[in-house]
Amino acid sequence: VKDPRHGGAGESGEQGTAGRQPKPKAKPRVPAVKGLKDDRFAGKTVRPGDTAEVQLKVSETVSHQPGRIPAIVLRGERAGPTVFVMSAVHGDEINGVAIVRHLIAGLSGRLERGTLIAIPVANRFGFDANDRYLPDRRDLNRHFPGDAKGNMALRIADHLFRKVVAISDCGIDLHTAAAGNSNLCHIRGDAGDAAVKGLMRATGVPVLVHSEGPRGSLRRAATEAGIPTILFEAGEAARFHRHAVEIGNHAALQLLSHVGLVGARFQPPAFQTLVRKSEWVRSDHGGILDLRVDPGDLVERKQPIGSIYDPYGRHVDVVHADRSGVVLGIATDPLIHPGMALVHIGQLDKTLQAARDYVASGGDLGYIRWKPPLRREGA
């Protein structure tokens, strides 16, 4: 399996698969009428005003037991849109699991209208093994909308898409960076789609990143099927970040307010910027990395952002920012090879000074501190 760091971190990185990845279906069937048909979901009746915990079968285990994933369905008394919240499509990305828990607890089983379908653990097999991938080493988030007759990943993706995504009006997919990386709390989506852009802005998250998403990703497949979907990206794999969970929970509530499921008034952010260009700064040398920046830091082009040392402690190279902007993500593993992704910088042109002013006034860009920088003389 390829190390995601070779292609960047999180949803957009190059991910390992077993052999060549089959192409998912291009045009999934999406019902004309959204929501629960006959008030039923996964064989269980969920009437308006009800809340139900459901087990959704998506596969089978090696012991021939049903491979089920948990789902929580909340319904308002009045008719309205259906929204899905999906988490742990990558099994070791668990911040979203906590976000769903806090979201459901905060709603206390009450919606003003419409339906919320929350999937705290989409990749049950990876989650049980604390692994990003499925047992066949495929990345579930490269196989949507799926195929009922395809490989394991395609079949699970097909179940999730047909039973959850296709009956929804919009959705949000919750992710973290891949192992060995940490990401700023930010929203990704296809800002060229007006409905998607509206959802992105509605979350109130300060940093938005324009990206259609990799082919086969949940949000891209859903958006192409006419179901505008965005992605919340924050923190790192296999651990909870309290701050990321708080921001993600608030973002999800803002989205639900925007589409009318909850009565809370939408609170516009004091600052918000849309990043349209971003690149990873990569290493030209192997060695031991000492980074000077964290996700959320603002940097200037040519600014030193880290140093590389050899095992004897000798200085090998200085890493510089290749553009001015905001640090979207960093490598947290200090052991690097040439070409590895070190720092992901989102380019800010007109809004860089506004971002600085916002931070200076006490504003929060979704900052996540990985570790105190190790300062060295002469570095």
Give the positions of each predicted feature.
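Structured catalytic-domain cores with a bias toward divalent-metal coordination
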Residues: 2-379
